[in-house]
Amino acid sequence: LVKLDQSPYKEFFILKGGFLLSATYGLDVRATRDLDTTIRGFSLTEDKVKEICQFIEQPSANENFQFTVRKIKAIRNHFDYQGYNIKLHFQLGRGKFPIEIDLTTGEELLPISKTEDIPLLFSDRSVQFYVYPLKQIFADKLYIILVYAPFDFKISRLKNLFVIFFFSKLNN
């Protein structure tokens, strides 16, 4: 998030999914290694994704970490909207950690005007990003389970069902 916060693309990223729920509500039991985002404001092409990756890989002057892009893959072949999965290595000192970023576009969105303070994992700082409304996250997960699960069983994975369960407890 630090790199995206420093990027010229920051205003186009909308955070969503399990990472957002974990960061916002401190859901340690729903550990996630990927960052789900929706892009608005520009056309999401492979060239644009490569451009974003080049920025992410650039060393930061004041930071002691490095990102290396391992793979970029088109995703969402059965979906109504396109996307890309970026596999990265995050290197902090001698430790190397796999991270994934999913970039999607084209979803029908509720109005997005809210930013959220997202605490950073290896720092006492936080960054602000636009975020999906909770209703949008719930609707997306329910839609994915009901519509796409017949095509791909992995889509109805436990993590999507957990989000539905979480919302049922949140509203009690």
Predicted regions and their residues:
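Compositionally biased terminal segments of proteins
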Residues: 1-172
